[in-house]
Amino acid sequence: MGFRLITQLKGMSVLLVLFPTLLLVMLTGAQRACPKNCRCDGKIVYCESHAFADIPENISGGSQGLSLRFNSIQKLKSNQFAGLNQLIWLYLDHNYISSVDEDAFQGIRRLKELILSSNKITYLHNKTFHPVPNLRNLDLSYNKLQTLQSEQFKGLRKLIILHLRSNSLKTVPIRVFQDCRNLDFLDLGYNRLRSLSRNAFAGLLKLKELHLEHNQFSKINFAHFPRLFNLRSIYLQWNRIRSVSQGLTWTWSSLHTLDLSGNDIQAIEPGTFKCLPNLQKLNLDSNKLTNVSQETVNAWISLISITLSGNMWECSRSICPLFYWLKNFKGNKESTMICAGPKHIQGEKVSDAVETYNICSDVQVVNTERSHLAPQTPQKPPFFPKPTIFKSDAIPATLEAVSPSPGFQIPGTDHEYEHVSFHKIIAGSVALFLSVAMILLVIYVSWKRYPASMKQLQQHSLMKRRRKKARESERQMNSPLQEYYVDYKPTNSETMDISVNGSGPCTYTISGSRECEMPHHVKPLPYYSYDQPVIGYCQAHQPLHINKAYEAVSIEQDDSPSLELGRDHSFIATIARSAAPAIYLERITN
């Protein structure tokens, strides 16, 4: 009985172990199921470019990323993604979505990134994005949205990036971004916005970059951007802006970049830039500006880059404040400013026209202090030219005046430049002294620590110089000496001297060196026929033998007809050899 009970318990234990294992395997297999025509990479599902008209089935509930880009989805139904509660990002761009149900995003509360760009969405319900309060990135660009609901983005307190580019928006509702307190980037470019309400951007305390380019604004008042303390860049290019004004009662110290290019700005109100003390980059090209006032350029105290080309500059006395400001400006600037008037200087560069026609010759420059100090920021450059004020001839003589000239400098800045130069000289001298001291210290330590090595180096250098000198002397000794040659032209008298006396003068010459005379002893008895030279000169290393023996005849044969006394004895023999120290003569007998 006990044995059977033990056996049954063992069987049950095996089943209890196997059943959960099989169940776990089945659940795992179900979770890893990948829809047809899709690609699954772990917890990421890619169902792209397969003309899906609806959301594919069998998508794992544990998926964290789903891409449905480049398909044919036309509508997002209610609870469309309810089973994907682990989803973190969802890409639905480049479809044909025109309708989005109010509850389409129910059940995916953890969603952080939603891309709906490049669709045909014309309307979004007020509560469309309420089920996804954790969104960080929302892209609605390149759709056909005409309006935004007043509570369109309510509850999106964690939203950082919002794209509304290339829609058909005409207005921005008041306080529509009130809850987007962490928004960092907002793009409203390429819409049909004509105006902005005073509180359109209320609540965007952390906004850093705002795009409003390619809209239909006709005027801009900085009062429309209330207390955007962290805004660094605002882009307003290619609108229809005719005037720029400011109604701020506070200093907008955070703004560094302002792009107003491609508008219809004809004039800038004096004092417009006083509220922007830290403005560093300003684009005013492709407008209709004719001049810039002295008060305006005085407010450009922190600029490091400016573009002014493509305007209708009037090259008269009104251009002088801007001309002198640009002349002293040390940052990046556009140099292609062209005169639009008067007619006789149209098409000429502003700088050339002013200097050629002495337009500003009677304008006096007075150095003034800044009316206010800009708050210090990390991005502010350490030094910029001080603004100047231009006066007419009516300025009292008590003021210090400087007439414009090519070498014009602002008074009061020389000391600053001298101070900087003096410090640079001191720093350079100290650096040079320390470098020399370090080199000498290294040499001294090496000499003290390794004296034998230093001596060896010196001896090695000395031996090397000696070897070099020895090689040079050897090269000089072994250089090829000049060739020897013998030019022997015996006359009849010399021949007779040799025949009778047994000796005669013989001269050989070392070209370019010296001459010597050596006697050649010949026995008087034999006679020689001069088919070959009588003597051989200048042997080098080996004796030079006359190849043919001399033909000697006895005195008894003196009357023989074979003796030809009329032979020509002016035969010339020249022998050339390499130089050799030993030279001797040898006669070969028959």
From Swiss-Prot:
Expressed in the brain (at protein level). Glycans are attached at N58, N126, N291. GO terms for molecular function: heparan sulfate proteoglycan binding. The chain crosses the membrane at residues 425-445. Its main location: membrane. It is found in: Cell membrane; Postsynaptic cell membrane. LRR repeats lie at residues 60-83, 84-107, 108-131, 132-155, 157-179, 180-203, 205-227, 228-251, 252-275, 276-299. Keywords: Cell membrane, Glycoprotein, Leucine-rich repeat, Membrane, Postsynaptic cell membrane, Repeat, Signal, Synapse, Transmembrane, Transmembrane helix. It is a single-pass type I membrane protein. Residues 311-362 form the LRRCT domain. Residues 31-59 form the LRRNT domain. PROSITE patterns: LRR. The keyword Transmembrane applies. One of its GO terms (cellular component) is glutamatergic synapse. Residues 31-424 are extracellular. Residues 446-590 are cytoplasmic. Residues 1-30 form the signal peptide. GO terms for biological process: AMPA glutamate receptor clustering; neurotransmitter-gated ion channel clustering; positive regulation of synapse assembly; regulation of presynaptic membrane organization; regulation of synapse assembly; synapse organization. Belongs to the LRRTM family. Peripherally associated with AMPAR complex. AMPAR complex consists of an inner core made of 4 pore-forming GluA/GRIA proteins (GRIA1, GRIA2, GRIA3 and GRIA4) and 4 major auxiliary subunits arranged in a twofold symmetry. One of the two pairs of distinct binding sites is occupied either by CNIH2, CNIH3 or CACNG2, CACNG3. The other harbors CACNG2, CACNG3, CACNG4, CACNG8 or GSG1L. This inner core of AMPAR complex is complemented by outer core constituents binding directly to the GluA/GRIA proteins at sites distinct from the interaction sites of the inner core constituents. May play a role in the development and maintenance of the nervous system. Exhibits strong synaptogenic activity, restricted to excitatory presynaptic differentiation. This is Leucine-rich repeat transmembrane neuronal protein 4. The gene is Lrrtm4.
